[in-house]
């Protein structure tokens, strides 16, 4: 019975991944097409999604690579430092037998769903597998399409923004009490850094400032 319960939770996680899957496929497709357009091989584009699985950071990597190798390495790292916070929250919420696997699949959208819905690690792994499969599959389709497609700039921008929009839609219902203050404080800090052309630094500063500023009233 215990085994069936774990299996059921894994399937439930897969089901909950459906909204993420629907958003990931077109964006990953765009990544595959863009990578081929910028001169990356099929293998390189696929390895980026298979081994990195980091959405916006992958776009940053392939667009910055030809300009500066250091920027292509360090900007994605800075963009992903927020996942340290995500991982610590999930680690406190769930008892993890496979922390390295769970950490690898923890994207913004997976975190937004799992922070309230995940009942155990099996659910989280199912949620992550569905999301990861969609991202890798979408990339493969984009790589196959390659440079035969002309990627309109407006379409590209809309598809990339859809990931951020999905994250907001999944996260907003969870914002209550001091979480609202954390979101507003973090957003203000991020915006200030963005206006100073320090967007990457602003992401990290916002991730740190939001929780700190939200706790000023002693809650």
UniProtKB/Swiss-Prot annotation:
GO-annotated cellular components: plasma membrane
Membrane topology: Multi-pass membrane protein
Compartments in which it is found: Cell membrane
Major location category of this protein: membrane
Biological-process GO terms, alphabetical: L-valine transmembrane transport
TM segment ranges: 14-34, 37-57, 123-143, 155-175, 189-209
Residues making up the signal peptide according to the UniProt record: none
Stored Pfam families: AzlC
Keywords carried by this UniProt record: Cell membrane, Membrane, Transmembrane, Transmembrane helix, Transport
Similarity section: Belongs to the AzlC family.
Name assigned to this protein: Uncharacterized membrane protein AF_1755
Organismal lineage: Archaea, Methanobacteriati, Methanobacteriota, Archaeoglobi, Archaeoglobales
């Amino acid at each position: 019975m215990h085994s069936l319960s774990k299996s059921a939770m894994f399937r439930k996680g897969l089901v909950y991944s459906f909204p993420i899957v629907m958003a990931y496929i077109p964006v990953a497709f765009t990544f595959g097409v863009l990578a081929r357009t910028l001169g990356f091989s099929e293998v390189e584009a696929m390895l980026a999604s298979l081994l990195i699985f980091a959405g916006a950071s992958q776009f940053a990597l392939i667009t910055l690579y030809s300009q500066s190798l250091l920027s292509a390495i360090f900007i994605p790292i800075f963009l992903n430092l927020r996942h340290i916070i995500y991982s610590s929250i999930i680690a406190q919420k769930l008892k993890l037998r496979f922390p390295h696997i769970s950490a690898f699949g923890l994207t913004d959208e997976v975190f937004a769903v799992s922070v309230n819905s995940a009942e155990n690690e099996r659910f989280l792994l199912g949620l992550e597998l569905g999301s990861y499969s969609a991202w890798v599959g979408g990339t493969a389709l984009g790589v196959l399409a390659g440079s035969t497609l002309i990627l309109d700039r407006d379409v590209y921008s809309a598809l990339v923004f859809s990931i951020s929009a999905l994250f907001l839609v999944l996260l907003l219902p969870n914002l209550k009490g001091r979480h609202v203050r954390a979101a507003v404080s973090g957003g203000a800090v991020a915006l200030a850094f963005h206006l100073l052309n320090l967007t990457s630094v602003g992401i990290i500063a916002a991730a740190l400032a939001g929780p700190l500023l939200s706790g000023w009233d002693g809650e």
